[in-house]
Design a protein with these regions (language model features):
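Conserved N-terminal phosphate-binding loop of PLP-dependent enzymes in the Aspartate aminotransferase
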Residues: 1-443
C-alpha cells in the first residue's frame, strides 16, 4: 500500500525545488514527537522541524482535538464573517507583540504574509521601493522571491518585480568588508545601508524588510546593535520596518519573536510556520495601529478566500497554548545552550566545520574545505556538479536515520522545541558520523 502511495505521489504530484526525474523521497507513514517513521518502520529524527515549522513536535493530540471540535461546529466562512477562533487568536497575537501592534491580517503562509506586508507598506507610505538583504529568503511568490536575495529567483523571472533593492548582510564569518570583529562588520553594514538609502532616495523607500533572526540563508547572526541601528535609520528617514518572523517566530529563538533580541518595535511583523506548528496552513501580518487607522475611512485592498480560516485559527490557539503551558521558551533557551556545548566539542573533532551559528534552537553548521581560507564545501548558489560532497553527507544523514534541512554548504539544526537533551545527543552523533565524509576533503 505505502509503496504504491509513494509511487502515486511521484507520478501525479509536483515536487518543489527538485528535478522531477529520479526522485526517491522518504514516504512518511506516521510522525510522533521528534520522529518520523517510513513505510518500513524506519525511524528518522527530525532535526529541522521539517522546514523549521513543527515547533511543538509531531502528533500533538491537543491540536488534533482543537481542529476536530472546530470542524464539527464550523469549518469555514468567508473573511467578512467573524468567528470565535478568529477573534481569540487576534487578541492573543496582540498580547504577545508590542502594544502598538493590535490587529492581524491572516494569510495562508509565509510568502503570502510577506507579499501582503510589502503591498500594505506601499499603500500606506505612497512610496514604492523595498530594501532587503542579499542573503535572505522571504518566500517564492513572484514578489517575495524578488524581495529575497535567493539567486534561484533569476530562473523564475530575469526581469523580476521592480523596485526591490538589496544590500550586503553583516555576515561576519564572510564579511564583505573584511572586518576584524562582529561589531565592525555591523557598523560597516549600517554605513552601507545608509548610503544605499541616500542613493535610492528616502522619499522613494516604503520599507526595509529583514528577518527577526536569519534562517534558511545560513542563520547569519546580526552583530550587536545592528538591527537596532536599522530601526534608527528607518525612523530617521521615515521608512517602515517590516520584520519577517516566519521562521524565527513563535519561541524558535528563545523568545516569542526573534526581533525581541534587538530592542526594536517593528511597524509590521510577518508570521507563519510556528503559529500552527505546520498542522494547518496559516500566516499573517501583525500591523501597527498607525498603519491600520489610515484605512478607517477607505477600503483596504487586500483579500484572500481563506483569510482568517476558522479551523486554522483554532489550531493556532491550541499550539500557542502548548507553548505557554509547556514553557517552551524556557526549554528552547536551555536546549539551545546544551546544543552549543555539544557543538563546541564537535568543532574540535571535525575540521570541516567552519562555523556554527545558533540562536535558541535555530542553528546552522557551515562546512568548509579549509578553515583558514574558508573555502566552502559547496559554493553559494552551487550547481549540481558542485554539490557532490554535500550530497554524500546528506545521503549519510538519511541512511543513519535523520531528516534535516540542508542547503549548499549548510546543515541546519533546528529540532522541535520539545526536544530533550538525549534527543539532541542522538542527532548530533548522527551529524558527527555524516560530516566525517566531509572531513576527508579538507586540506
Amino acid at each position: 500500500m505505502y509503496t504504491n502511495s509513494k509511487q502515486l505521489s511521484i507520478d501525479h504530484t509536483i515536487f518543489a525545488w527538485s528535478n522531477q526525474k529520479g526522485l526517491n523521497p522518504i514516504h512518511v507513514e506516521k510522525a510522533k514527537g521528534v520522529y518520523l517513521y517510513d513505510e518500513k518502520g524506519k525511524k528518522y529524527i527530525d532535526f529541522s522541524s521539517q522546514l523549521m515549522n513543527v515547533n511543538v513536535g509531531h502528533g500533538r493530540e491537543e491540536v488534533t482535538e482543537a481542529v476536530r471540535k472546530q470542524m464539527e461546529n464550523l469549518s469555514y466562512v468567508c473573511p467578512p464573517f467573524t468567528t470565535d477562533s478568529r477573534g481569540r487568536l487576534g487578541k492573543k497575537l496582540a498580547e504577545i507583540t508590542p502594544n502598538n501592534l493590535n490587529k492581524t491580517f491572516f494569510t495562508l503562509g509565509g510568502a503570502e504574509s510577506n507579499e501582503n506586508a510589502i503591498i500594505l507598506a506601499r499603500l500606506y507610505s505612497n512610496k514604492h521601493k523595498i530594501i532587503t538583504h542579499y542573503r535572505s529568503y522571504h518566500g517564492a511568490t513572484i514578489g517575495t522571491i524578488t524581495a529575497g536575495g535567493d539567486p534561484r529567483k533569476n530562473e523564475v523571472d530575469s526581469q523580476q518585480v521592480p523596485n526591490c533593492v538589496h544590500v550586503e548582510n553583516p555576515y561576519y564569518y564572510r564579511c564583505p568588508w573584511y572586518s576584524s570583529s562582529p561589531e565592525e562588520c555591523g557598523e560597516r553594514a549600517i554605513n552601507n545601508l545608509e548610503k544605499t538609502i541616500l542613493y535610492e532616495g528616502p522619499k522613494n523607500i516604503a520599507a526595509i524588510l529583514m528577518e527577526g533572526e536569519s534562517g534558511s540563508s545560513g542563520c547569519i547572526k546580526y552583530p550587536p546593535l545592528y538591527l537596532k541601528k536599522v530601526d534608527t535609520l528607518c525612523k530617521k528617514y521615515d521608512i517602515l520596518l517590516i520584520i519577517d518572523e516566519v521562521m524565527s517566530g513563535f519561541c524558535r529563538t528563545g523568545k516569542w519573536f526573534g526581533y525581541e533580541h534587538h530592542d526594536i518595535k517593528p511597524d509590521i511583523i510577518s508570521i507563519a510556520k510556528g503559529i500552527t506548528s505546520g498542522y494547518i496552513p496559516l500566516g499573517g501580518i501583525i500591523v501597527s495601529d498607525e498603519i491600520v487607522n489610515t484605512f478607517n475611512d477607505k477600503a483596504l485592498p487586500l483579500g484572500l478566500t481563506y483569510s482568517s480560516h476558522s479551523v486554522a485559527c483554532a489550531a493556532a490557539l491550541a499550539v500557542i497554548d502548548i507553548y505557554e503551558k509547556e514553557n517552551l521558551i524556557e526549554n528552547t533557551v536551555k536546549i539551545g545552550k546544551y546544543t552549543d556545548e555539544l557543538m563546541d566539542k564537535l568543532i574540535e573533532q571535525h575540521p570541516s566545520i567552519g562555523d556554527w551559528r545558533n540562536t535558541g534552537m535555530l542553528g546552522c553548521l557551515e562546512l568548509v574545505k579549509n578553515r583558514k581560507t574558508k573555502e566552502p564545501m559547496a559554493p553559494f548558489n552551487a550547481d549540481p556538479s558542485e554539490m557532490k560532497i554535500m550530497n554524500k553527507v546528506t545521503a549519510k544523514l538519511r541512511e543513519l536515520g535523520m531528516f534535516t534541512y540542508s542547503k549548499w554548504n549548510f546543515i541546519f539544526v533546528a529540532p522541535p522545541l520539545i526536544a530533550k537533551k538525549e534527543e539532541i545527543e542522538e542527532g548530533i552523533e548522527i551529524i558527527s558520523k555524516a560530516i566525517s565524509i566531509a572531513d576527508e576533503f579538507c586540506y
